[in-house]
């Protein structure tokens, strides 16, 4: 793995997960773990001592939201960059973690890479 950045992508849409994985790994420099909800995300949190970024859809199947997972991820990995995504323009953003980046679907690769970079900068201690 070397200097690859470790990214966790959480979405309940398999097509979105696959597209994001292809995009992030194809761009280079990213090692991607995909989770189709909170169970997969929690397993990834347990399995990896380090994550550079978490990208999570706000609305997930079940009771846990992407915001909940980002908050948990930040507690477990204090310097993780957080990117919250959603296609719903009216989604409730209450509880959005401090220093996270919001990105509205649909978005392009350049927007995603810029959001990850911005989230990582915001997550660094001052």
Regions found by a protein language model. Give the residues of each.
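Non-catalytic signal-transmission and effector/linker regions of two-component phosphorelay proteins
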Residues: 1-8, 18-21, 108-126
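Hydrophobic/aromatic residues positioned on beta-strands within the core alpha/beta folds
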Residues: 85-86
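Acidic, metal-coordinating helix/loop segments flanking the phosphotransfer/catalytic sites
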Residues: 34-53
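Short amphipathic alpha-helix used as the core "switch/output" element in two-component signaling
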Residues: 67-78
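A Lys-centered signature of the CheY-like receiver
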Residues: 105
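Two-component/phosphorelay signaling modules centered on CheY-like receiver
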Residues: 14-33
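Active-site residues of response regulator receiver
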Residues: 57-58
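Acidic catalytic/metal-coordinating carboxylates
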Residues: 36-37, 64-69
């Amino acid at each position: 793995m070397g200097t690859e950045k470790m990214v966790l992508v959480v979405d309940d849409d398999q097509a979105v997960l696959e597209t994001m994985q292809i995009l992030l790994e194809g761009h280079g420099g990213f090692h991607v773990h995909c989770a189709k909800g909170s169970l997969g995300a929690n397993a990834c949190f347990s399995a990896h001592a380090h994550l550079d970024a978490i990208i999570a859809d706000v609305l997930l199947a079940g009771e846990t939201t992407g915001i909940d997972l980002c908050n948990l991820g930040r507690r477990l990995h204090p310097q993780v960059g957080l990117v919250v995504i959603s296609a719903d323009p009216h989604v409730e953003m209450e509880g959005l973690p401090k220093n996270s980046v919001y990105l509205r679907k649909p978005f392009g690769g350049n927007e995603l890479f810029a959001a990850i970079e911005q989230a990582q900068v915001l997550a660094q201690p001052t």
